[in-house]
Regions:
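Active-site-adjacent loop and "lid" segments of alpha/beta metabolic enzymes
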Residues: 2-62, 66, 82-168
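Acidic/histidine-rich catalytic cores of soluble enzymes
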Residues: 79
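Short acidic capping loops at alpha-helix termini that bridge into adjacent secondary structure
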Residues: 69-72
């Protein structure tokens, strides 16, 4: 394996053993409020950014306490996993606060319902909103973006990078 994608961020039994069996791979820790069955029916309350920040910081430190080098850790703020539309957009707007922890950040906005909420588009029509969100996440410092439409996102990022390097 190249990466362990832990959507439970060490909250499931056996996770530490899986990580230990793969000492050369990266570990992505994602924030998910509650569990898949209840996360959307009872989303987070209050300042989601501060709660996600605290949760991910604790999970990353717990992983390091197990002997995992911090350079192997990537954090994912878990768009759509128990958060309201407003909270999801607040996480993007305040992504710099998450980056201040010093870990690479993954943003997974592709086809998310929050994009549908602001555009009115069905999931299979969210290409442009998804690419737009990926570009904004990268511009705001995300190191990795999780996408469905790889070719289109790569093309958009190439144009964005060229425009930034030329000062346009």
């Amino acid at each position: 394996a190249d990466i362990v994608n832990d959507v439970w961020a060490l909250r499931q039994p056996g996770t530490a053993q899986v990580v230990a069996r793969h000492p050369a791979c990266g570990i992505c820790l994602m924030h998910m409020h509650r569990d898949p069955q209840t996360m959307q029916s009872a989303p987070m309350e209050g300042d989601a950014v501060l709660q996600v920040l605290s949760f991910l910081k604790r999970a990353a430190l717990d992983l390091q306490a197990l002997g995992v080098n911090r350079q192997r850790i990537v954090l994912d703020y878990g768009i759509g996993f128990g958060k309201t539309v407003e909270q999801n957009f607040a996480l993007l707007a305040r992504q710099d606060e998450l980056l201040a922890m010093g870990y690479p950040l993954l943003a997974g906005w592709s086809r998310k319902s929050s994009l549908g909420a602001v555009t009115g588009l069905d999931v299979d029509q969210r290409l442009i909103p998804s690419v737009t969100a990926a570009l904004l996440a990268v511009e705001r410092g995300a190191h990795v973006v999780r996408v469905h439409d790889v070719r289109e996102t790569v093309q958009a990022l190439a144009v964005w990078k060229a425009m930034r390097s030329e000062g346009l």
